[in-house]
Amino acid sequence: MIREVLVEPQHIVWLPWIVNYFFFVGVAATAVFTAVLFAKKAQKPTACEQSAVLVAFIGSIVAPVALTADLHQPSRILHFYTDFAWWSPMAWGAIILPLFSVAVAGYFVLTLAHNTQPNLPKWLVWLNLPLLRSQGLLWAFRLFSLLTAVGIIGYTVLETYQTGTRALWHSAWLLPIMLFSAWAVALGLTRFLVRSDERSVSLQILLILTALSVAGLAFSSETAQRDFALLFNGSITAYLTGICWIIALVCSFSSKNHRLQWLGVLALIGFGWWLRWVLVIQTQTIAKTNVLQNPYHFDWLAVDGGLGIVSIFGLAVLVTVGVGQIISLTTQQEK
């Protein structure tokens, strides 16, 4: 019986840009879920809801930039609209993503308007408009954001699942893995911004559910078991993912130690990002038709490598600082 087919090694198609996109858009979408869960009827947005919306807003800005960089030619986006392919998840994503960004931006502005101080800088006085403090409008944008967030999770998972070329992609376990891992990061960032000293059982549950989902994926079929084992062969990324998961889980039990809070948040971010790297990039190195592994050289100085990753996270920091300054201007007390 012929067990191998001699073929040329295949170069990977998805580059690190798509990992950044899946990470930030996943965190943004699940942060919306978190915000809506913290929402209370006929009341101003709580601190937890505001923090979750802030996380979603930052992610909704950074994620499209990473996706545009992955396309290399921004003008290619127009083809999704001029030649709409209803069967393609990417075509639907071209519609859902802009709607999601608009919804989250509106949600963020409305939560900001509900908690502003009377004396605002001239360029921010429009936040005091009575319309922006309407509970009905706020709930409308909560629902708008929630629906588009569900669409984001659905299309990003389906985009990977529909390829059907690899056992680790074409699996129902992909949805809970992407959902729970991103939600853990979103919840962890929200709690960190609120500076909560209470132990988060929800965060621990999400981390455990992610681990169980990964185990379910690994043992879903013989091919998946083989491919999953190859991910640990000669690569440190899969081990880094596991280490970050352990650190994040341990730190979640020590919420009153601020140093451990910092470590826990960094571990959560590392876990969520590395998990997507392993599932998206590392999985592509596993050959589909022979026992060899496809080559992939990571270049730290390349735009499609380390430089691109650092630039996207740098953009996230820049957006965080800028939005943080706006929040401080709108909520500062009158002297």
Language-model region placement:
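Membrane-entry segments of alpha-helical transmembrane domains in multi-pass membrane proteins
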Residues: 10-26, 45-52, 83-99, 133-143, ...
